[in-house]
């Protein structure tokens, strides 16, 4: 997809997000995270030039390479790691220039390692934002902690990980729910997880994020309370994989 088409798509998506927020009774704000996996640094830079700042990567190697290439060109780019976390790669994630948030923390073990690694790589920076990934669909092929355990993990991060900032909850909805009409039960469940956490802690639910919704269902996610949506193919076109 050409730079011009991507920039036009970005403009249209930003407008759609803004309109959806205005119409939503469940959220007053929503961030667009442009999911750039398998896409070139040039396309990311083209979006950055149009004031897009938040970008998401699923693969550690891509995050490493792109963040390094763009560090001197896109000075305030904000990278989100949104892929499955592997313990032995957490150090590489934390060492990526411009890392802003890890959205896929699902165990205390991973939280502890991120806390330790960020103290090395991000010693002069603010605490690393992390989201607790919740498996709202109950599918075995989806990452995330069980719904009932999510508030507990959030509190573990808040109380035990001084180099991390618990910043909310994230989910990847099931394919069927994402392509059905009407209310999405996965989004409803994540919204309730945040409410439960707020009730248990006395904190404001609105003080933390709800990252839910992707290219096919981000408007519905905003309708149901998303404060951050992850849009890839609708912005950049279909994923591109090298021939093996």
UniProtKB/Swiss-Prot annotation:
GO terms for cellular component: cytoplasm. One of its GO terms (molecular function) is pyridoxal phosphate binding. SUPFAM superfamilies: PLP-binding barrel. Gene3D superfamilies: Alanine racemase. Keywords: Pyridoxal phosphate. One of its GO terms (biological process) is vitamin B6 metabolic process. It comes from the Eukaryota. InterPro entries: PLP-binding_barrel, PyrdxlP_homeostasis. Belongs to the pyridoxal phosphate-binding protein YggS/PROSC family. Pyridoxal 5'-phosphate (PLP)-binding protein, which may be involved in intracellular homeostatic regulation of pyridoxal 5'-phosphate (PLP), the active form of vitamin B6. NCBIfam families: YggS family pyridoxal phosphate-dependent enzyme (TIGR00044). This is Pyridoxal phosphate homeostasis protein.
């Amino acid at each position: 997809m050409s730079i011009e088409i991507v920039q036009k798509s970005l403009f249209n998506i930003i407008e759609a997000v803004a309109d959806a927020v205005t119409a939503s009774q469940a959220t007053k704000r929503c961030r667009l995270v442009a999911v750039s996996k398998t896409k070139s640094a040039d396309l990311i830079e083209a979006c950055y030039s149009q004031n897009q700042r938040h970008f998401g990567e699923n693969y550690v190697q891509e995050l490493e390479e792109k963040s390094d290439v763009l560090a001197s060109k896109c000075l305030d780019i904000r990278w989100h790691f949104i892929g499955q976390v592997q313990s032995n790669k957490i150090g590489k994630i934390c060492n990526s220039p411009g890392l802003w948030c890890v959205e896929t923390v699902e165990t205390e073990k991973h939280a502890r390692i991120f806390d330790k690694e960020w103290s090395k790589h991000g010693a002069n920076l603010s605490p690393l934002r992390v989201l607790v990934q919740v498996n709202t669909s109950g599918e075995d092929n989806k990452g995330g902690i069980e719904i009932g355990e999510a508030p507990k993990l959030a509190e573990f991060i808040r109380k035990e990980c001084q180099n991390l900032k618990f910043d909310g909850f994230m989910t990847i909805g099931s394919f069927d729910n994402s392509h059905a009409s009407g209310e999405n039960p996965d989004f409803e469940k994540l919204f309730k997880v945040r409410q439960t956490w707020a009730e248990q802690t006395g904190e404001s639910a609105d003080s933390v994020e709800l990252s839910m919704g992707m290219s096919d269902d981000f408007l519905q996610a905003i309708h149901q309370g998303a404060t951050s949506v992850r849009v890839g193919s609708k912005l950049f076109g279909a994923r591109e994989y090298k021939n093996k």
